[in-house]
């Protein structure tokens, strides 16, 4: 039995009654039609009535939202400035620790940021480009990324990520994130980033014009809101240059085609993996990444060959006491169980810096 909802049959009746076409009656076998009450959304159906070359179609009768919008677990908050989305950790997103990798976390941060700006009407042709940016061939590129993970989600865990953006002076914009465990509401991570504008044709940085700023400021909180509100938090620490010779190295890293993004260069998440390639194996075996900070200094293209260098940060260079995100003071005992490293990514050909980094590792906990 063919079943159509009452809503759909009404649409069909109105369509034929309002049409100016003249339809030649066609004798067809009578088929029973039953109507039923819809419990959730009205049926999105397609019906065709063919005679010769003519075709009448009724489709997607309810809303103008796209299938992607209906499948996402994301929404703008009531203030209209921040955006939240839920993600389930999939099996291919976990690593040797049976938890999500830092690359997975970074990819989710990028995904929720892109979904946020797409939700408010920015273009999907590039990362959050406004109308003026598209006219002037301008794109956003990452200048700095700082991620702190207090607890890594495991396979099948659901993570809720909140994000928002705001102006960062005359040269760029800032985006922050807060990650929560959906099951407990516990904050399991925070992140912040700085973005600058680049001309897509010349590949040179460009100041943010008033016209572009006016286009995105309407979606930024009127008052500053920071994921790391403390003035002395580690996200603000300057990363010194790593001097030769480095203690650890991984030479000759080559970008894969899959590492390139829609901005025609190596995506910022790939740099995280390259930095970790030169971490000593004994640290990987006994520790997990707690904090990573990256300063992006130069874009990397597909034909570039990259060297990853790492050196332990000496105790004198490590701040022994920092105010934590909950207002507590980090104990020296806790610092003793952690390892700190400085990193640099540079071109193999001429030694030009691509990226500077700092990582902080804690002892693995038993699960």
Swiss-Prot record:
A single GO BP: fatty acid biosynthetic process
Active-site positions on this chain: 263, 265, 300
SUPFAM superfamilies given in the database record: Thioesterase/thiol ester dehydrase-isomerase
Class of the enzyme per the UniProt entry, highest EC level: hydrolase
Claim: Kinase is one of the keywords in the record: no
Key words, A-Z: Chloroplast, Fatty acid biosynthesis, Fatty acid metabolism, Hydrolase, Lipid biosynthesis, Lipid metabolism, Plastid, Transit peptide
Family per record: Belongs to the acyl-ACP thioesterase family.
Protein's name according to its UniProt entry: Oleoyl-acyl carrier protein thioesterase 2, chloroplastic
Originating organism: Arabidopsis thaliana
Source species taxonomy: Eukaryota, Viridiplantae, Streptophyta, Embryophyta, Tracheophyta
Protein encoded by which gene: FATA2
């Amino acid at each position: 039995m063919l079943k159509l909802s009452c809503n759909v049959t009404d649409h069909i009746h109105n369509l034929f009654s309002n049409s100016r076409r003249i339809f030649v009656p066609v004798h067809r076998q009578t088929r029973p039609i039953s109507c039923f009450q819809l419990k959730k959304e009205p049926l999105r159906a397609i019906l065709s009535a063919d005679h010769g070359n003519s075709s009448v179609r009724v489709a997607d009768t309810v809303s103008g939202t796209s299938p992607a919008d209906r499948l996402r677990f994301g929404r703008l908050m009531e203030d209209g400035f921040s955006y939240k989305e839920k993600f389930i950790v999939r099996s291919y997103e976990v690593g040797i620790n049976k938890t999500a990798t830092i690359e997975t976390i970074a990819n989710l941060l990028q995904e929720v940021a892109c979904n946020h700006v797409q939700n408010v009407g920015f273009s999907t042709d590039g990362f959050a480009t406004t109308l003026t940016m598209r006219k002037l061939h301008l794109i956003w590129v990452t200048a700095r990324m700082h991620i702190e993970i207090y607890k890594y989600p495991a396979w099948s865990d659901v993570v809720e990520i909140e994000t928002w953006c705001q102006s960062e002076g005359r040269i760029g914009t800032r985006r922050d994130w807060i990650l929560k465990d959906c099951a407990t509401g516990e904050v399991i991570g925070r992140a912040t980033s700085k973005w600058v504008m680049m001309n897509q044709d010349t590949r040179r940085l460009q100041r943010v014009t008033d016209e572009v700023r006016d286009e995105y400021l309407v979606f930024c909180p009127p008052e500053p809101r920071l994921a790391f509100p403390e003035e002395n938090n580690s996200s603000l620490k300057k990363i010194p240059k790593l001097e030769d010779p480095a203690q650890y190295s991984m030479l000759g890293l080559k970008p894969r085609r899959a590492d390139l993004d829609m901005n025609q260069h190596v995506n910022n998440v790939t740099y995280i993996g390259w930095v970790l390639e030169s971490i000593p194996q004994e640290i990987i075996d006994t520790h997990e990444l707690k904090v990573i900070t990256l300063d992006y200094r130069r874009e990397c293209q597909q034909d570039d060959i990259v060297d990853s260098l790492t050196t332990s940060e000496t105790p004198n260079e490590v701040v022994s006491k920092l105010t934590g995100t909950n207002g507590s003071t980090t104990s020296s005992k806790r610092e003793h169980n952690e390892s700190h490293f400085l990193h640099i990514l540079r071109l193999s050909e001429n030694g030009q810096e691509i990226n500077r980094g700092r990582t902080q590792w804690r002892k693995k906990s038993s699960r």
